Amino acid sequence: MMMRFLSAVVIMSSAMAVGLVSAQRCGSQGGGGTCPALWCCSIWGWCGDSEPYCGRTCENKCWSGERSDHRCGAAVGNPPCGQDRCCSVHGWCGGGNDYCSGSKCQYRCSSSVRGPRVALSGNSTANSIGNVVVTEPLFDQMFSHRKDCPSQGFYSYHSFLVAAESFPAFGTIGDVATRKREVAAFLAHISQATSGERSDVENPHAWGLCHINTTTVTENDFCTSSDWPCAAGKKYSPRGPIQLTHNFNYGLAGQAIGEDLIQNPDLVEKDPIISFKTALWFWMSQHDNKPSCHDIVLNANSAANRIPNKGVIGNIISRAFGHDDFAVRSSSIGFYKRYCDMLGVSYGHDLKYWFDNTPSSEFQRIQMRVAA
């Protein structure tokens, strides 16, 4: 579903080259309002992301509190980096061009930015997604069978929005059409993974989010990596919207969202917020220094002349299960087109290319090899 349809990185105006500024008021001088994710509130009551807003004249959400391990980015909740330090595309805080310039920088950048960052209309990413992209009535229409199929309403709209708050870049980058396409692509992938492959029903693309656990009966415990010692008696089988699989993926996902999923892998099938977070973690995270699905959808790595094609995506998602067949591709594209139609947005360019050349169905049984 990750498609070559999105616009090139927007060239920011000279006024924004040293930091993004919004007309949004905040703090004690701005009526008590708060700034969007990754922005700071100055003592004068305005939101921005440069030194005057986040440094010595900052009132709240300031440049401070860099993690002791110096990690940053969506995989760890987008924590701040210290003053004069930036978050690189590989998820580390640091200074200099390797962290702060152009396509190498993820946020807190010193010169250019990798893509348009949008000041949210409310106080949270969830508020933005809910108000601008997917409303609750529309979500219920998209997944009209989720309450009467095996998942029994487990995947709620509220859980989706709460989980999205931990990944503020999801569905908030670019214009409204771009944001809608990213959400449509994400929802299409998790729908394909959880549909139970209902090809025998009248409208199979209305049956997303129907399963929590894998529908394949197996005794495999998926304890495949010595880097993440498995808990006694636990299985790391496919669970949740993205069908998270293998102990190393449970370990890394849990580390990113602050849950011990090695000791408690069942949380992915019992807590819907955690379940959605694991899917968003996979979507937003870079694996083995490859671009994330989010980046590929946004064509964020175009500056490095890396066309998001089968080769790039294939480096992120392995083909171990061999589900790259026409029927699954057709089902995936069907979900995507249905959601785009419901969101009132075009499909984008080169749709046939993407589904003929991208093993998108591997999202159905996640097997990505990531560094522990």
From Swiss-Prot:
Membrane-crossing segments per the record: none
Give residues where Pyrrolidone carboxylic acid occurs.
Answer: Q24
Which residues does substrate bind?
Q24, S42, I43, W44, G45, W46, C47, G48, D49, S50, E51, P52, Y53
Please report any disulfide bonds recorded for this protein chain, giving both cysteine positions. C26-C41, C35-C47, C40-C54, C58-C62, C72-C87, C81-C93, C86-C100, C105-C109
EC assignment: the record states 3.2.1.14
Any one Gene Ontology molecular-function term assigned to this protein's record: chitin binding
The record lists Zn(2+) 1 as bound by H70
Using the record, list the residue span of the signal peptide; answer none if the entry has no such feature: 1-23
Modifications made to the protein after synthesis: Proteolytically processed to yield a very small protein (8.5 kDa, 86 AA) containing only the two chitin-binding domains.
Q: What does this protein do?
A: Functions both as a chitinase and as a N-acetyl-D-glucosamine binding lectin. Inhibits the growth of several phytopathogenic chitin-containing fungi. Also possesses insecticidal activity and superantigenic properties.
Protein's name in the database = Lectin/endochitinase 1
Q: What is the source species?
A: Urtica dioica
Query: What gene, per UniProt, encodes this protein?
Result: UDA1
